[in-house]
């Protein structure tokens, strides 16, 4: 049985989120939670919250032991980009891109 959780419009760049996602792909849910809790990257907090949500979704659907769940698929897609203008010297300006991403996490029971 698969359980899915999606975090949309996360205010973190897709590149930085992928750095964390690539480290937890294929791990068991319990190991990944522990791994994410002590990871120094900002993206780890987003992923930890998302993983807890996916585990809760699995428990809601069917009585499942979280330790028997494994991360089957996880990926990061680019979301919309907010553009801001930063004034510079001599009447110029720079565009600051505040990137967002959509993170998808799919859990499945280990056989």
Regions found by a protein language model. Give the residues of each.
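Structured, basic alpha/beta domains of bacterial-type, RNA-associated proteins
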Residues: 1-23, 27-111
């Amino acid at each position: 049985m698969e359980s899915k959780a999606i975090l949309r419009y996360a205010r973190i760049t897709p590149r930085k989120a992928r750095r964390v996602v690539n480290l937890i792909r294929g791990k068991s849910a319990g190991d990944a939670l522990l791994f994410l809790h002590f990871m120094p990257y900002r993206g780890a907090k987003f992923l930890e919250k998302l993983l807890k949500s996916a585990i809760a979704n699995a428990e809601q659907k069917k009585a499942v032991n979280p330790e028997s769940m494994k991360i089957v698929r996880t990926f990061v897609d680019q979301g919309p980009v907010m553009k801001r203008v930063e004034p510079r010297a001599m009447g110029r300006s720079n565009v600051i891109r505040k990137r967002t991403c959509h993170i998808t996490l799919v859990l499945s029971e280990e056989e």
